Amino acid sequence: MIIKKFKGEIKSIIDLSKTAKEIKIALSEPIDFEPGCFVNLFLDIGNEKVRRAYSISSPSNDRDNITLTIRLSPNGLLTPIFWNKNMTGTHIELMGPLGLNTVDKMKLNKVYLFAFGVGTGVVKSIADHFSKVEKLEKLVIITGSRSEDEILYKEYFNSLAENSDKISVMRVVSKLPEGSNIPRGYIQDHIDGLDFNNSDVYVCGQEKACNDLITKIKSTNPNGCNYFIEGFH
């Protein structure tokens, strides 16, 4: 992958939940990236050029457009703008693609993708890639959310599982009303019985959540398990 600076125009913004949006950006020039990559986004705010890193959530076969899935940080400089102002048509600067935890490094035929919150966006891109890998034997996708309203890309992941008996999807929610049939708690509460031997494990989300999950997986002493951890604050 060649890292470069380029420009983009925000073409559309979709509300995924009260705290998450998907931003589609038309690029000034095509880029090649591996799923799992991120870009740095630069935006002029006042007299300051603000930079933030966002993972790419779109498939890698579209080189002219990318989507970024962003989470509202109420006290942040950049994301509140997308909730308070119509940013469609805004021209931005980007740099990338960047990242170490990318699909070209995941060589095994059994893959686990775990996502907390907005980390579901990059897992969507990675899942799209592996759904097209013929030698894949098993792809397990588990996402974790605070509430049912914050589950992201539900229909997309359901469609993957419906179209392949090699793919399974589970959603775990920490805060649920009584009587809900959705698995309750955290992802690490629902991995008993999974075989992590000879597998690639990708985790994306807030750093503590990622570390807690990896600790639980490592406690099972799997052999030949590779870890790809994308933690953020």
PLM feature spans:
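Reductase modules of NAD(P)H-dependent flavoproteins
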Residues: 2-4, 63, 142, 146-233
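Conserved hydrophobic positions within beta-strands
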Residues: 10-13, 56
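A generic structural motif
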Residues: 14-17, 60
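FAD-binding FR-type
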Residues: 21-112, 147, 175, 232-233
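Short, conserved phosphate/pyrophosphate- and ester-handling motifs at nucleotide-, phospho-/glycolipid
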Residues: 36, 119, 206
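Phosphate- and divalent-cation-binding pockets in alpha/beta enzyme and binding domains
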Residues: 102, 122-125, 152, 212-213
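Histidine-anchored nucleotide/phosphate-binding helix
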Residues: 120-132
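Conserved S-adenosyl-L-methionine
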Residues: 132-138
